[in-house]
Amino acid sequence: MAAKDVKFGNDARVKMLRGVNVLADAVKVTLGPKGRNVVLDKSFGAPVITKDGVSVAREIELEDKFENMGAQMVKEVASKANDSAGDGTTTATVLAQSIVNEGLKAVAAGMNPMDLKRGIDKAVVAAVEELKKLSVPCSDPKAIAQVGTISANSDETVGKLIAQAMDKVGKEGVITVEEGSGLQDELDVVEGMQFDRGYLSPYFVNKPESGTVELEHPFILLADKKISNIREMLPILESVAKSGKPLLIIAEDVEGEALATLVVNNMRGIVKVTAVKAPGFGDRRKAMLQDIAILTSGTVISEEIGLELEKATLEDMGQAKRVLITKDATTIIDGVGNKSSIDSRVAQINQQRDEATSDYDREKLQERVAKLAGGVAVIKVGAATEVEMKEKKARVEDALHATRAAVEEGVVAGGGVALIRVANAIRNLCGDNEDQNVGIKVARRAMEAPLRQIMANAGEEPSVIANNVRSGEGNTGYNAATEKYGNMIELGILDPTKVTRSALQYAASIAGLMITTECMVTELPKEDKPDLGGGNPGGAGGMGGMM
């Protein structure tokens, strides 16, 4: 076991705080309408220019192990906010930095860290309740477009595109973002389906920057059985390898030797393959496999109807224009299925729904109709260069997540105003002792940090604007883009309630744990043993220092 370096008390906290501040300072320059870009160097290809907080956070690794621990914990805040709401990563980072800085000052002044954390937690619970009271529903296309615009860094065309996409496929519909071929953004609605099953192994991923699998014009094998023996798959794998197309396997499960062999073949480039579990359970799984078969013009390989996997041919495979697979969802875009077959299948499911006796069955049948008939909206992002394309695509994806969050839980006034109103609403909140009261003050002060950072990035004086907004009422705030005060909701400066709530909860959770840290342990760096000269044994003399 390697030797460890251990730091205690203030020594540990100072190092950790330095790491927190390095990461947060890099991320927070992107906040607000006048936030700046960050350029990320890549080991291959052009650098990436981004204004997305979580993309910046993920790139940062610090040389000092103790500082790096602090940075990694704040990175976790950004990642959690991103996973939960798809946006608000920079806000979460700014909140976490403020809570950690103020909290550690209080610890240095002699406050009890555990009581401080309890005070912070109390304040956050009360703040979330107040946020819910401030929230207004977001249902009309104009509000949806405004949320998309704000999240895409005030790009109105993106907001309008997302609103149009939601209008065409419904608020629960499937919307994907891909790189276009021209300079203009485009919206395309195609036949498609999404189900909640992701890839069975991360080794299938072929887009590591987004952690997804993208297959162009794949064959789709549908099997109503568990696949554990690779031998029964060999004939079809050989046929697919000869065709040069990728293969998507949708089966009850793929496990053991079969999964391992598929992974190895994929990694070696022998055949581009991905496996996912079939959606649903029991009879519903059989029905959904049949839905996918009709959508992709394939055949479900099932022993119940006398079809065996060993005898499957390319004619039994379904096909689609494109398949996108994340760790928890699969989207089939533009299956080659016959329109009349899809329509008759939809009519058949509708009839079953009308005859269903339970609400649960009706709901599940309605879901199947939506998947088959709803289609998929594809937003094609246009840009002049590859670098701009990647940056813009990331912004559009952020905006899409924010818009979905807004539809789900409503919106609050943007520009950091909602958090200032919430901090004011809980000003009379008291803890069980004085240290908890300090914790509540730390959380309330942190709630002003996003507005202050937006103002700092816009070149304004944060304290003056924060005081003016605090003395205002309702949704009155400061528009950093136009440098005017006004009603944020009426001005279309909206934040999804879910995004603001998630940012606050995750920031407080991890910052609270950091404040209560008393000891940090890390491995000591290995010292390079000095070269003994005279070359290596075995005739490799003179090559000792070369890699």
Swiss-Prot record:
<comment type="subunit">
    <text>Forms a cylinder of 14 subunits composed of two heptameric rings stacked back-to-back. Interacts with the co-chaperonin GroES.</text>
</comment>
<dbReference type="GO" id="GO:0140662">
    <property type="term" value="F:ATP-dependent protein folding chaperone"/>
</dbReference>
<feature type="binding site">
    <location>
        <begin position="479"/>
        <end position="481"/>
    </location>
    <ligand>
        <name>ATP</name>
    </ligand>
</feature>
<dbReference type="Pfam" id="PF00118">
    <property type="entry name" value="Cpn60_TCP1"/>
</dbReference>
<keyword id="KW-0413">Isomerase</keyword>
<feature type="binding site">
    <location>
        <begin position="87"/>
        <end position="91"/>
    </location>
    <ligand>
        <name>ATP</name>
    </ligand>
</feature>
<dbReference type="InterPro" id="IPR001844">
    <property type="entry name" value="Cpn60/GroEL"/>
</dbReference>
<dbReference type="GO" id="GO:0051082">
    <property type="term" value="F:unfolded protein binding"/>
</dbReference>
<comment type="function">
    <text>Together with its co-chaperonin GroES, plays an essential role in assisting protein folding. The GroEL-GroES system forms a nano-cage that allows encapsulation of the non-native substrate proteins and provides a physical environment optimized to promote and accelerate protein folding.</text>
</comment>
<keyword id="KW-0963">Cytoplasm</keyword>
<keyword id="KW-0067">ATP-binding</keyword>
<dbReference type="InterPro" id="IPR027409">
    <property type="entry name" value="GroEL-like_apical_dom_sf"/>
</dbReference>
<dbReference type="GO" id="GO:0016853">
    <property type="term" value="F:isomerase activity"/>
</dbReference>
<dbReference type="InterPro" id="IPR027410">
    <property type="entry name" value="TCP-1-like_intermed_sf"/>
</dbReference>
<feature type="binding site">
    <location>
        <position position="415"/>
    </location>
    <ligand>
        <name>ATP</name>
    </ligand>
</feature>
<feature type="region of interest" description="Disordered">
    <location>
        <begin position="525"/>
        <end position="547"/>
    </location>
</feature>
<dbReference type="InterPro" id="IPR002423">
    <property type="entry name" value="Cpn60/GroEL/TCP-1"/>
</dbReference>
<feature type="compositionally biased region" description="Gly residues">
    <location>
        <begin position="532"/>
        <end position="547"/>
    </location>
</feature>
<dbReference type="GO" id="GO:0005524">
    <property type="term" value="F:ATP binding"/>
</dbReference>
<feature type="binding site">
    <location>
        <position position="495"/>
    </location>
    <ligand>
        <name>ATP</name>
    </ligand>
</feature>
<dbReference type="GO" id="GO:0005737">
    <property type="term" value="C:cytoplasm"/>
</dbReference>
<feature type="binding site">
    <location>
        <position position="51"/>
    </location>
    <ligand>
        <name>ATP</name>
    </ligand>
</feature>
<dbReference type="InterPro" id="IPR018370">
    <property type="entry name" value="Chaperonin_Cpn60_CS"/>
</dbReference>
<keyword id="KW-0143">Chaperone</keyword>
<protein>
    <recommendedName>
        <fullName>Chaperonin GroEL</fullName>
        <ecNumber>5.6.1.7</ecNumber>
    </recommendedName>
</protein>
<keyword id="KW-0547">Nucleotide-binding</keyword>
<feature type="binding site">
    <location>
        <begin position="30"/>
        <end position="33"/>
    </location>
    <ligand>
        <name>ATP</name>
    </ligand>
</feature>
<dbReference type="InterPro" id="IPR027413">
    <property type="entry name" value="GROEL-like_equatorial_sf"/>
</dbReference>
<comment type="similarity">
    <text>Belongs to the chaperonin (HSP60) family.</text>
</comment>
<dbReference type="GO" id="GO:0042026">
    <property type="term" value="P:protein refolding"/>
</dbReference>
